[in-house]
Amino acid sequence: FYHYGTSREMISSTLSIQNLVYDQRRIMHLGVKPHPSIFIQNALCKTALTEQNSNTWIENSCVGEHWQLHGSNIITGVPENDWHVDLPLGVCLDMVPIDTPLPNAYALRPYGMHDAFRGDITLPDTTYMGVSMSEWASLRGVNLEDIQPQADLQAARIFPISQDMKALERMLNWMVSNAGDVEAREMWLKAPKVCANELSDQANLRRLQAQREDFRSQNLTALAANHRRSVFYQTNLDDMA
């Protein structure tokens, strides 16, 4: 039984399903995947990954050459970009296409691998991206009481919406690592925001699927060109039959 419940369980269950070959001599090309718990699908990944990037999941996303990932990162929904991003250990990112209140916009939702997403955001034991939510806000000069008093984290409108990819890049880095960026703070304060509860209601699933199909098409072209090293061309057809 494989349970796709929490973020960590999604990776651990997929790892259990996929790692069925224990005799490394049966794998024609070793070293293609630097760690068994790295999963990339329907995505463009241009940054170098190593064995330090365990528990990494990239789906329907563009991770450019200027991205730095440190392990235990889940990245979903990120459109093509040329961003410079430093995603710390255990920090994840979901981007959701939204057309309200701005058309052709994206909501930016960074979160922690182990976030429970519950609890009053003003209480010290409510965590966000691995730290107290109140500490996260204090480091960034944000007064949570001014934004949404006594909100549960799941219902707190902290995820900014923008049509501007450069603004989204700036706000992302401010939210996950560069807490001292004053201009990014102002962008975040002025931007319309949604909560986790609202994302599923407002997501434009057609845009999300169109992006996935575009990435998949690019992946299939790359797989065909890389047939000498692709695991799909190693399939034993007798076993499959």
What are these regions (language model features)?
Residues 1-241:
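Left-handed beta-helix
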